[in-house]
């Protein structure tokens, strides 16, 4: 019997992958990878690119792809059997990669390549890989004595297990709560199509004649924005804000995991000779130091504060004068804000949503990308992991295949929350001269279609789709011959969001929105007067939103950037202090935000959440080139592909930016686009 995790092909046979395949596949692929490591590190193996780096990359690629596929399925098709198989193999996979990163013999081979006469003859990309690998060996503790190296390895294994458990707890806590409503009058104010969705959810659970609200965003958010019942909103807000905390079952409480992760990260930093974990985190990033990040964030906070305070005062005044609310409670904020926005700009998110059917949005987004970047996008076919999933192909103007990508767009209980792009395979030129075609995943959590109507997207959903497709284009349009530098591989973490945030700008262009809007009942495109209202409201509460993001970023930085404390016992106090300094909207006393902050405790953004704002500066300034030269100027689009999207990490991100823009980045376009200037 063949094993689809071993017999991989250009596209994986997703429905053929069973949990019983996972361990045997990893047994075989780990053994082959270990053999390859032993061969390239043997004393008689010459320290050359072709004898060490190429064969090792080829051996590791199959293992990495198989394990990534298991991780992908864990994120989109969670089940008890899959979870058991993933968790059973996580320790040995973590051990393999940690031991590889600390392998003294392999480290010595890379150093020998760098110091050899042949090094100068290598391409610039190959030289860059060697230098980066040497840096990463040092960051992994390859130069440490045996005892601290073993300790660092143990900490790394524990971190991997605890990060995954954090994510599992959050998903389980999100799924554990539902609010079943007996009387439709309790849903007063909520749009009819959302109420229909609640009825469908209840019916699917065997509760005919009732309505079920969950904590998944397509269900939770409309209730918080539109429900006139304060008691309904309070119940939902309390449940959402206390997920995976001490307010629920102990086995789903993420507090002990946060404490352990913070302790371990500080210990890892000290073992490596750094003062704190933030210093370690920033070594491969654009930002020079934690102090530089702190200065960047506090400067932005100062510039946004006046607008944020004005936004909050407007909310409170409207609540008192129009809604008879003397106090705006945490569960009132979204409802009052949406009511204020409707009153101020005379439109609702629900009204806009009727114009954005998923098929029309996809078609319009693809046509835009085709025009900007001279490619063609068409639906493809191949076995997929769920009926909701589709496969697409990107070709050049002559029809030659460039890349493929899967889309998995609807929320379901087996899928973790949020939206993301991930990669299956990365573009590269193989040793035999053939090309590996990149394959990407585009995953979202949109509302399902109801009845015979297509799925409807909010404008925020449209923006999210553009964002994730921006990541996908960065991965798929890469033309770097070395896989280690191709796509998003090796791109500085604080620059990797630049192409995604860059694409969001077209979701605010009327000519673009005309091509991707089609009213669900009439087929009419988005009217110009409605768009004008949306545009006028674009920076509605932008000060509040900016300060909220800066609150998250400063909290993340400060729990990791302290020479004297790991903040394991007082991380909530750190958050409270950041809120006192930055926030304008009071948090609920019961809020346990950190326990659901998966970005930094399970998503790779530890001491790196600032990256979103850092990359916004780059993306806003990059988009201003299109504002200056024409939004649909193919020459500007080609320059963006040539100097940024196709480059991967073959150059530093700042060099890519300078090559595209002709100068260093400016913060002014971001402040202007945000309405803060």
Identify the function of each model-found stretch.
Residues 125, 129, 168, 172-214, ...:
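Active-site-proximal, well-structured secondary-structure segments within enzyme catalytic domains
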């Amino acid at each position: 019997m063949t094993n689809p995790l071993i017999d991989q092909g250009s596209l994986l046979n997703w429905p053929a992958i069973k949990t019983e395949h996972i361990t045997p596949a990893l047994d075989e692929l780990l053994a082959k990878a270990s053999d390859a490591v032993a061969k390239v590190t043997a004393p008689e193996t010459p320290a050359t690119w072709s004898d060490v780096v190429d064969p090792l990359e080829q051996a590791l690629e199959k293992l990495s792809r198989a394990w990534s596929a298991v991780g992908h399925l864990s994120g989109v098709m969670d089940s008890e059997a899959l979870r058991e198989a993933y968790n059973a193999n996580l320790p040995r996979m973590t051990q393999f990669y940690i031991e590889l990163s600390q392998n003294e013999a392999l480290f010595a081979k890379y150093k020998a390549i760098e110091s050899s006469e042949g090094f100068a003859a290598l391409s610039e990309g190959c030289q860059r890989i060697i230098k980066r690998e040497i840096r990463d060996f040092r960051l992994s503790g390859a130069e440490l004595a045996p005892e601290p190296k073993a300790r660092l390895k143990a900490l790394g294994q524990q971190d991997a297990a605890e990060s995954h458990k954090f994510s599992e707890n959050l998903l389980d806590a999100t799924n554990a709560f539902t609010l079943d409503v007996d009387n439709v009058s309790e849903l007063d104010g909520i749009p009819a199509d959302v109420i229909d969705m609640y009825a469908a959810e209840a019916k699917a659970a065997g509760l005919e004649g009732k309505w079920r609200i969950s904590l998944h965003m397509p269900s939770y958010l409309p209730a918080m924005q539109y429900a006139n019942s304060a008691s309904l909103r309070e119940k939902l807000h309390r449940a959402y804000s206390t997920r995976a905390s001490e307010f629920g079952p102990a086995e789903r409480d993420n507090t002990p995991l946060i404490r352990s992760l913070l302790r371990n990260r500080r210990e890892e930093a000290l073992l490596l000779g750094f003062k704190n974990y933030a210093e370690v985190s920033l070594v491969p990033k654009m930002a020079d130091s934690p102090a530089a990040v702190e200065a960047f964030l506090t400067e932005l906070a100062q510039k946004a504060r006046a607008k944020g305070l004005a936004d909050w005062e407007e909310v409170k005044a409207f609540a008192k004068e129009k809604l008879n609310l003397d106090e705006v409670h945490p569960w009132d904020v979204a409802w009052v804000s949406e009511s204020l926005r409707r009153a101020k700009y005379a439109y609702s998110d629900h009204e806009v949503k009727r114009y954005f059917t998923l098929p029309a949005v996809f078609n319009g987004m693809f046509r835009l990308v085709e025009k900007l970047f001279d490619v063609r996008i068409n639906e493809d076919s191949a076995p997929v992991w769920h009926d909701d999933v589709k496969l697409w192909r990107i070709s050049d103007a002559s029809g030659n295949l460039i890349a493929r990508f899967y889309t998995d767009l609807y929320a379901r209980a087996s899928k973790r929350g949020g939206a993301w792009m991930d990669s299956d395979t990365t573009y590269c030129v193989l040793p035999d001269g053939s090309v590996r075609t990149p394959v990407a995943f585009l995953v979202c959590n949109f509302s399902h279609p109801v009845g015979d109507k297509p799925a409807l997207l909010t404008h925020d959903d449209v923006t999210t789709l553009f964002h994730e497709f921006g990541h996908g284009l960065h991965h798929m349009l890469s033309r770097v011959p070395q896989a280690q530098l191709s796509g998003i591989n090796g791109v500085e973490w604080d620059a990797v969001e630049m192409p995604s945030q860059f694409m969001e700008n077209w979701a605010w262009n009327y000519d673009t929105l005309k091509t991707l809007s089609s009213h669900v009942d009439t087929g009419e495109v988005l009217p110009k007067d409605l768009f004008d209202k949306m545009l006028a409201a674009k920076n509605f509460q932008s000060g509040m939103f900016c300060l909220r993001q800066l609150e998250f970023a400063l909290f993340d930085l400060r729990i990791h950037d302290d020479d004297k404390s790991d903040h394991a016992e007082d991380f909530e106090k750190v958050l409270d202090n950041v809120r006192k300094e930055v926030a304008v909207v009071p948090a609920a006393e019961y809020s346990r935000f950190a326990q659901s902050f998966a970005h930094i405790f399970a998503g790779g953004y530890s001491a790196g959440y600032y990256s979103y704002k850092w990359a916004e500066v780059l993306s806003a300034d990059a988009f201003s080139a299109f504002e200056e030269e024409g939004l649909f100027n193919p020459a500007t689009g080609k320059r963006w592909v040539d100097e940024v999207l196709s480059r991967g990490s073959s150059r530093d991100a700042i060099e890519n930016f300078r090559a595209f823009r002709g100068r260093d980045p400016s913060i002014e376009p971001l402040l202007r686009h945000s309405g803060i200037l």
